[in-house]
Amino acid sequence: MSVVYKGQVIDSELSKNSFGGTEMMRERLIKNVDPKWLEKCAIHFSRPRQLFEDVINVLYCHDLAEDPENNILANGGWKKFDHIVFVSAWQRDQYITRFDIPYSHTTVIYNAVETQYEPVTKDVETIRFIYHTIPHRGLELLVPIFDTLAKHYPNIHLDVFSSFGIYGWEQRDEPFKQLFKRIEDHPNMTYHGHQPNDVVLEALKKSHIFLYPNVWKETSCIAMIEAIKNQVICIHPNYGALTETAANATIVYEYNEDPATHANYAFSIAAQVLKVQQENPNYFNRFTYSDRYNLARNNIDSFTNVWNQVLSLLVQNAESKKEDIIYQHSDN
Protein backbone atom coordinates (compact mmCIF):
# COMPACT_ATOMS: atom_id res chain seq x y z
CA MET A 1 0.00 0.00 0.00
CA SER A 2 2.93 2.30 0.68
CA VAL A 3 6.68 2.03 0.98
CA VAL A 4 9.30 3.69 3.15
CA TYR A 5 12.15 4.13 0.68
CA LYS A 6 15.41 5.41 2.18
CA GLY A 7 13.44 6.79 5.09
CA GLN A 8 10.87 8.63 2.95
CA VAL A 9 7.22 7.64 2.47
CA ILE A 10 5.95 6.86 -1.02
CA ASP A 11 2.15 6.59 -0.83
CA SER A 12 -0.16 4.69 -3.15
CA GLU A 13 -3.69 5.71 -4.12
CA LEU A 14 -5.01 3.36 -1.41
CA SER A 15 -2.83 4.69 1.39
CA LYS A 16 -2.60 8.43 0.74
CA ASN A 17 -5.82 9.27 2.65
CA SER A 18 -5.57 6.50 5.21
CA PHE A 19 -4.61 6.63 8.85
CA GLY A 20 -5.33 3.14 10.10
CA GLY A 21 -3.15 0.76 12.07
CA THR A 22 -0.71 0.17 9.20
CA GLU A 23 -0.08 3.89 8.85
CA MET A 24 0.42 4.18 12.63
CA MET A 25 3.15 1.54 12.46
CA ARG A 26 4.72 3.29 9.48
CA GLU A 27 4.86 6.54 11.44
CA ARG A 28 6.39 4.81 14.47
CA LEU A 29 8.94 3.05 12.27
CA ILE A 30 10.14 6.32 10.73
CA LYS A 31 10.08 8.16 14.04
CA ASN A 32 12.00 5.59 16.07
CA VAL A 33 14.16 3.29 13.93
CA ASP A 34 17.76 4.35 13.30
CA PRO A 35 17.87 6.43 10.06
CA LYS A 36 21.19 4.87 9.03
CA TRP A 37 19.39 1.53 8.56
CA LEU A 38 16.27 3.01 6.97
CA GLU A 39 18.48 4.85 4.46
CA LYS A 40 19.60 1.52 3.03
CA CYS A 41 16.19 -0.17 2.83
CA ALA A 42 12.81 -0.11 1.16
CA ILE A 43 10.13 -1.31 3.58
CA HIS A 44 6.97 -2.28 1.73
CA PHE A 45 3.77 -2.08 3.80
CA SER A 46 1.82 -4.95 2.20
CA ARG A 47 0.69 -4.92 -1.44
CA PRO A 48 4.05 -3.92 -2.97
CA ARG A 49 3.96 -2.14 -6.31
CA GLN A 50 7.64 -1.56 -7.06
CA LEU A 51 10.86 -3.22 -5.96
CA PHE A 52 14.12 -1.25 -5.80
CA GLU A 53 17.51 -2.46 -6.99
CA ASP A 54 19.64 -0.01 -5.01
CA VAL A 55 18.43 -0.96 -1.51
CA ILE A 56 17.35 -3.93 0.60
CA ASN A 57 13.68 -4.81 0.05
CA VAL A 58 11.72 -5.79 3.18
CA LEU A 59 8.06 -6.79 3.01
CA TYR A 60 6.14 -5.72 6.13
CA CYS A 61 2.93 -7.76 6.08
CA HIS A 62 -0.23 -6.55 7.80
CA ASP A 63 -2.82 -8.38 5.68
CA LEU A 64 -4.14 -11.93 5.82
CA ALA A 65 -2.21 -14.54 3.86
CA GLU A 66 -5.24 -15.28 1.65
CA ASP A 67 -5.45 -11.69 0.40
CA PRO A 68 -5.13 -11.92 -3.42
CA GLU A 69 -2.47 -9.19 -3.33
CA ASN A 70 -0.14 -11.73 -1.73
CA ASN A 71 -0.07 -13.93 -4.83
CA ILE A 72 3.19 -12.15 -5.62
CA LEU A 73 4.73 -14.48 -3.02
CA ALA A 74 3.56 -17.69 -4.73
CA ASN A 75 5.86 -20.02 -6.67
CA GLY A 76 8.96 -18.70 -4.93
CA GLY A 77 7.95 -15.07 -5.37
CA TRP A 78 8.90 -14.43 -1.74
CA LYS A 79 12.55 -14.62 -2.88
CA LYS A 80 12.13 -11.16 -4.42
CA PHE A 81 12.29 -9.79 -0.89
CA ASP A 82 15.40 -9.86 1.27
CA HIS A 83 13.27 -10.40 4.37
CA ILE A 84 9.62 -10.52 5.43
CA VAL A 85 8.29 -9.08 8.70
CA PHE A 86 4.98 -10.13 10.26
CA VAL A 87 2.91 -8.64 13.08
CA SER A 88 2.07 -11.95 14.81
CA ALA A 89 3.30 -15.53 14.88
CA TRP A 90 -0.19 -16.66 13.85
CA GLN A 91 0.02 -14.51 10.72
CA ARG A 92 3.57 -15.66 9.93
CA ASP A 93 2.56 -19.31 10.13
CA GLN A 94 -0.35 -18.71 7.74
CA TYR A 95 2.04 -17.23 5.15
CA ILE A 96 4.66 -19.94 5.64
CA THR A 97 2.08 -22.68 5.12
CA ARG A 98 0.53 -20.99 2.08
CA PHE A 99 3.69 -19.86 0.28
CA ASP A 100 6.37 -22.25 1.59
CA ILE A 101 8.49 -19.41 2.97
CA PRO A 102 11.43 -20.50 5.18
CA TYR A 103 11.17 -19.42 8.82
CA SER A 104 14.72 -18.05 8.52
CA HIS A 105 13.47 -15.54 5.97
CA THR A 106 10.99 -14.05 8.45
CA THR A 107 10.71 -12.12 11.71
CA VAL A 108 7.72 -11.31 13.92
CA ILE A 109 7.69 -7.72 15.20
CA TYR A 110 4.65 -6.99 17.33
CA ASN A 111 2.70 -3.78 16.77
CA ALA A 112 3.61 -1.00 19.17
CA VAL A 113 1.53 1.65 20.90
CA GLU A 114 2.72 4.77 22.66
CA THR A 115 0.33 4.32 25.59
CA GLN A 116 1.98 3.25 28.85
CA TYR A 117 0.10 1.07 31.31
CA GLU A 118 -0.42 3.33 34.32
CA PRO A 119 -3.30 1.91 36.39
CA VAL A 120 -5.70 4.27 38.11
CA THR A 121 -8.91 3.81 40.05
CA LYS A 122 -11.69 4.38 37.53
CA ASP A 123 -15.15 5.66 38.41
CA VAL A 124 -17.54 2.70 38.04
CA GLU A 125 -20.88 4.43 38.63
CA THR A 126 -21.49 4.13 34.88
CA ILE A 127 -19.80 1.17 33.18
CA ARG A 128 -18.62 2.42 29.82
CA PHE A 129 -18.27 -0.02 26.93
CA ILE A 130 -16.29 0.97 23.85
CA TYR A 131 -16.05 -0.21 20.24
CA HIS A 132 -13.21 1.48 18.36
CA THR A 133 -12.49 -0.43 15.18
CA ILE A 134 -14.12 -0.57 11.74
CA PRO A 135 -17.77 -1.70 11.48
CA HIS A 136 -17.52 -5.02 9.64
CA ARG A 137 -15.43 -6.67 12.34
CA GLY A 138 -18.27 -7.23 14.80
CA LEU A 139 -20.43 -4.15 15.30
CA GLU A 140 -23.54 -5.85 13.88
CA LEU A 141 -23.36 -8.44 16.65
CA LEU A 142 -22.38 -5.99 19.38
CA VAL A 143 -25.32 -3.59 19.03
CA PRO A 144 -28.11 -6.13 19.72
CA ILE A 145 -25.99 -7.76 22.44
CA PHE A 146 -25.54 -4.41 24.16
CA ASP A 147 -29.19 -3.49 23.70
CA THR A 148 -30.16 -6.63 25.65
CA LEU A 149 -27.52 -6.00 28.32
CA ALA A 150 -28.82 -2.45 28.83
CA LYS A 151 -32.28 -3.79 29.66
CA HIS A 152 -30.79 -5.66 32.61
CA TYR A 153 -28.07 -3.16 33.57
CA PRO A 154 -29.27 0.43 32.96
CA ASN A 155 -25.99 1.92 34.27
CA ILE A 156 -24.02 0.91 31.16
CA HIS A 157 -23.18 3.00 28.09
CA LEU A 158 -21.60 2.13 24.73
CA ASP A 159 -19.34 4.57 22.84
CA VAL A 160 -18.84 3.61 19.19
CA PHE A 161 -15.89 5.01 17.23
CA SER A 162 -16.31 3.22 13.91
CA SER A 163 -16.15 4.21 10.26
CA PHE A 164 -14.25 3.31 7.11
CA GLY A 165 -13.57 7.03 6.92
CA ILE A 166 -10.37 6.34 8.83
CA TYR A 167 -9.07 4.84 5.57
CA GLY A 168 -10.62 7.54 3.41
CA TRP A 169 -13.30 5.07 2.26
CA GLU A 170 -16.48 6.75 3.52
CA GLN A 171 -18.54 5.07 0.80
CA ARG A 172 -17.99 1.71 2.50
CA ASP A 173 -20.01 2.95 5.48
CA GLU A 174 -23.19 2.83 3.39
CA PRO A 175 -24.24 -0.76 4.35
CA PHE A 176 -23.91 0.20 8.03
CA LYS A 177 -25.93 3.44 7.98
CA GLN A 178 -29.02 1.81 9.53
CA LEU A 179 -26.86 0.28 12.25
CA PHE A 180 -25.31 3.68 13.00
CA LYS A 181 -28.82 5.16 13.18
CA ARG A 182 -29.84 2.47 15.66
CA ILE A 183 -26.88 3.44 17.84
CA GLU A 184 -27.70 7.16 17.59
CA ASP A 185 -31.32 6.52 18.60
CA HIS A 186 -30.44 4.42 21.65
CA PRO A 187 -30.26 6.28 24.99
CA ASN A 188 -27.41 4.06 26.20
CA MET A 189 -25.28 4.34 23.06
CA THR A 190 -23.33 7.15 21.38
CA TYR A 191 -22.02 7.07 17.81
CA HIS A 192 -18.86 9.13 17.30
CA GLY A 193 -17.97 8.15 13.71
CA HIS A 194 -14.24 8.10 13.06
CA GLN A 195 -12.07 10.31 15.23
CA PRO A 196 -8.33 11.02 15.53
CA ASN A 197 -6.48 8.46 17.59
CA ASP A 198 -5.85 10.88 20.45
CA VAL A 199 -9.62 11.33 20.86
CA VAL A 200 -10.11 7.55 21.01
CA LEU A 201 -7.29 7.23 23.54
CA GLU A 202 -8.98 9.80 25.78
CA ALA A 203 -12.20 7.79 25.58
CA LEU A 204 -10.33 4.60 26.47
CA LYS A 205 -9.07 6.21 29.66
CA LYS A 206 -12.70 6.47 30.82
CA SER A 207 -13.82 3.09 29.45
CA HIS A 208 -14.21 -0.20 31.30
CA ILE A 209 -15.10 -2.91 28.78
CA PHE A 210 -14.19 -3.57 25.15
CA LEU A 211 -16.77 -6.20 24.18
CA TYR A 212 -15.57 -7.41 20.78
CA PRO A 213 -17.64 -10.18 19.13
CA ASN A 214 -15.14 -10.31 16.29
CA VAL A 215 -16.16 -11.94 13.00
CA TRP A 216 -13.20 -10.87 10.85
CA LYS A 217 -9.85 -12.61 11.19
CA GLU A 218 -7.20 -10.13 12.26
CA THR A 219 -3.45 -10.54 12.01
CA SER A 220 -3.10 -8.38 15.12
CA CYS A 221 -5.41 -5.93 16.89
CA ILE A 222 -4.08 -2.49 17.76
CA ALA A 223 -7.50 -1.52 19.15
CA MET A 224 -7.19 -4.32 21.69
CA ILE A 225 -3.58 -3.48 22.58
CA GLU A 226 -4.55 0.14 23.25
CA ALA A 227 -7.57 -0.98 25.27
CA ILE A 228 -5.50 -3.30 27.46
CA LYS A 229 -2.86 -0.62 28.03
CA ASN A 230 -5.66 1.74 29.08
CA GLN A 231 -6.91 -0.68 31.73
CA VAL A 232 -9.98 -1.89 29.83
CA ILE A 233 -11.39 -5.41 30.24
CA CYS A 234 -11.46 -7.00 26.77
CA ILE A 235 -13.92 -9.78 25.94
CA HIS A 236 -13.45 -11.52 22.58
CA PRO A 237 -13.38 -14.88 20.74
CA ASN A 238 -10.29 -16.99 20.07
CA TYR A 239 -10.34 -16.02 16.40
CA GLY A 240 -7.39 -15.20 14.16
CA ALA A 241 -4.52 -13.61 16.06
CA LEU A 242 -6.69 -12.14 18.83
CA THR A 243 -5.62 -14.66 21.48
CA GLU A 244 -1.95 -14.07 20.69
CA THR A 245 -2.47 -10.30 20.73
CA ALA A 246 -4.24 -10.53 24.09
CA ALA A 247 -1.28 -12.23 25.79
CA ASN A 248 -3.39 -13.61 28.68
CA ALA A 249 -4.69 -10.15 29.63
CA THR A 250 -8.28 -10.62 28.43
CA ILE A 251 -11.39 -12.77 28.74
CA VAL A 252 -11.55 -15.19 25.79
CA TYR A 253 -14.44 -17.35 24.59
CA GLU A 254 -14.79 -19.98 21.85
CA TYR A 255 -15.43 -18.57 18.39
CA ASN A 256 -18.51 -19.89 16.61
CA GLU A 257 -19.40 -19.37 12.94
CA ASP A 258 -23.11 -19.13 13.71
CA PRO A 259 -23.92 -15.46 14.50
CA ALA A 260 -26.65 -16.29 17.02
CA THR A 261 -24.46 -18.74 18.93
CA HIS A 262 -21.55 -16.31 18.82
CA ALA A 263 -23.74 -13.50 20.14
CA ASN A 264 -25.02 -15.71 22.96
CA TYR A 265 -21.47 -16.55 24.05
CA ALA A 266 -20.46 -12.88 24.08
CA PHE A 267 -23.64 -11.82 25.88
CA SER A 268 -23.28 -14.48 28.58
CA ILE A 269 -19.73 -13.51 29.45
CA ALA A 270 -20.44 -9.77 29.43
CA ALA A 271 -23.51 -10.31 31.61
CA GLN A 272 -21.45 -12.37 34.04
CA VAL A 273 -18.82 -9.63 34.28
CA LEU A 274 -21.50 -7.01 34.92
CA LYS A 275 -23.16 -9.20 37.56
CA VAL A 276 -19.87 -9.68 39.42
CA GLN A 277 -19.16 -5.94 39.19
CA GLN A 278 -22.62 -5.18 40.55
CA GLU A 279 -22.06 -7.52 43.50
CA ASN A 280 -18.49 -6.35 44.09
CA PRO A 281 -17.83 -2.69 43.14
CA ASN A 282 -14.07 -3.28 43.49
CA TYR A 283 -14.06 -6.05 40.86
CA PHE A 284 -13.15 -3.93 37.84
CA ASN A 285 -10.24 -2.12 39.44
CA ARG A 286 -8.90 -5.31 41.03
CA PHE A 287 -9.09 -7.16 37.69
CA THR A 288 -7.22 -4.47 35.78
CA TYR A 289 -4.49 -3.82 38.35
CA SER A 290 -2.11 -6.43 36.97
CA ASP A 291 1.32 -6.57 35.36
CA ARG A 292 -0.16 -8.66 32.54
CA TYR A 293 -1.75 -5.41 31.31
CA ASN A 294 1.70 -3.95 30.67
CA LEU A 295 2.23 -5.82 27.35
CA ALA A 296 5.95 -5.03 27.25
CA ARG A 297 6.42 -6.55 23.80
CA ASN A 298 4.06 -3.86 22.43
CA ASN A 299 6.08 -0.96 23.81
CA ILE A 300 7.85 1.45 21.46
CA ASP A 301 11.27 0.44 22.82
CA SER A 302 10.71 -3.24 22.06
CA PHE A 303 9.38 -2.45 18.58
CA THR A 304 12.34 -0.17 17.85
CA ASN A 305 14.99 -2.56 19.16
CA VAL A 306 13.79 -5.50 17.07
CA TRP A 307 13.53 -3.39 13.92
CA ASN A 308 17.05 -2.05 14.45
CA GLN A 309 18.38 -5.57 14.97
CA VAL A 310 16.69 -6.94 11.85
CA LEU A 311 17.68 -4.07 9.55
CA SER A 312 21.25 -3.81 10.83
CA LEU A 313 21.79 -7.53 10.23
CA LEU A 314 20.32 -7.31 6.73
CA VAL A 315 22.53 -4.32 5.88
CA GLN A 316 25.64 -5.98 7.27
CA ASN A 317 24.94 -9.18 5.33
CA ALA A 318 24.35 -7.24 2.11
CA GLU A 319 27.58 -5.28 2.53
CA SER A 320 29.49 -8.47 3.29
CA LYS A 321 28.21 -10.05 0.07
CA LYS A 322 29.31 -6.97 -1.90
CA GLU A 323 32.78 -7.24 -0.41
CA ASP A 324 32.95 -10.92 -1.35
CA ILE A 325 32.00 -10.10 -4.96
CA ILE A 326 34.63 -7.34 -5.14
CA TYR A 327 37.22 -9.72 -3.68
CA GLN A 328 36.35 -12.44 -6.20
CA HIS A 329 36.65 -9.97 -9.10
CA SER A 330 40.03 -8.78 -7.85
CA ASP A 331 41.26 -12.39 -7.78
CA ASN A 332 40.27 -12.81 -11.41
Language model features: what each stretch is:
Residues 1-51:
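N-terminal pre-catalytic "stem/leader" segment of glycosyltransferase-like enzymes
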Residues 19-24, 260-264, 278-322:
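A charged, aromatic-enriched C-terminal amphipathic alpha-helix characteristic of glycosyltransferases
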Residues 82-96, 101-118:
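Donor nucleotide-sugar binding/catalytic pocket of nucleotide-sugar-dependent glycosyltransferases
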Residues 121-138, 143-146, 150, 159:
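Conserved donor-binding/catalytic core segment of Leloir-type glycosyltransferases
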Residues 173-195:
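Nucleotide-activated donor-binding/catalytic signature segment of Leloir-type glycosyltransferases, i.e.
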Residues 205-219:
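Acidic donor-binding loop of glycosyltransferase active sites
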Residues 233-236, 243:
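Short hydrophobic beta-strand element within catalytic cores of glycosyltransferases
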